[in-house]
């Protein structure tokens, strides 16, 4: 393993990240996600994840 000064390797991209951002931009979805989790909140507002 060689360290080229780039820091830690990038984590795998989250395939749900775009949907997570949509939910976070909706105050109601964001609030519900705090209580029941993002995937369930997204499903209630927008349909299947």
From Swiss-Prot:
Which cysteines in this chain are paired by disulphide bridges? 23-29
The positions annotated for binding Ca(2+) 2 are: 21, 24
Give the UniProt subcellular location, in the record's own words.
Answer: Secreted
Q: Does the keyword Calcium apply?
A: yes
Family stated for the protein in its record: Belongs to the osteocalcin/matrix Gla protein family.
Tell me the protein's name. Answer: Osteocalcin
List the GO cellular component terms. cytoplasm; extracellular region
- What other remark does the UniProt record contain for this protein? Sequence data obtained by MS from permafrost fossilized bones about 55.6 thousand years old.
**Binding sites annotated in the UniProt record for Ca(2+) 3:** 24, 30
Molecular function via GO = calcium ion binding; hormone activity; hydroxyapatite binding; structural constituent of bone
**Gla domain: from which residue to which, for each copy?**
1-47
The function of this protein is:
The carboxylated form is one of the main organic components of the bone matrix, which constitutes 1-2% of the total bone protein: it acts as a negative regulator of bone formation and is required to limit bone formation without impairing bone resorption or mineralization. The carboxylated form binds strongly to apatite and calcium. The uncarboxylated form acts as a hormone secreted by osteoblasts, which regulates different cellular processes, such as energy metabolism, male fertility and brain development. Regulates of energy metabolism by acting as a hormone favoring pancreatic beta-cell proliferation, insulin secretion and sensitivity and energy expenditure.
Q: Which residues form a coiled coil?
A: none
User: Which InterPro entries does this one have?
Assistant: GLA-like_dom_SF, GLA_domain, Osteocalcin, Osteocalcin/MGP
* PTM info: Gamma-carboxyglutamic acid residues are formed by vitamin K dependent carboxylation. These residues are essential for the binding of calcium.
- What keywords were assigned to this record? Biomineralization, Calcium, Disulfide bond, Extinct organism protein, Gamma-carboxyglutamic acid, Hormone, Hydroxylation, Metal-binding, Secreted
In-chain residues carrying the UniProt-annotated modification 4-carboxyglutamate = 17, 21, 24
Q: Hydroxyproline (modified residue): where?
A: 9
Residues binding Ca(2+) 1 are 17
GO biological-process terms attached to the record: biomineral tissue development; bone development; brain development; cellular response to insulin stimulus; cognition; glucose homeostasis; learning or memory; negative regulation of bone development
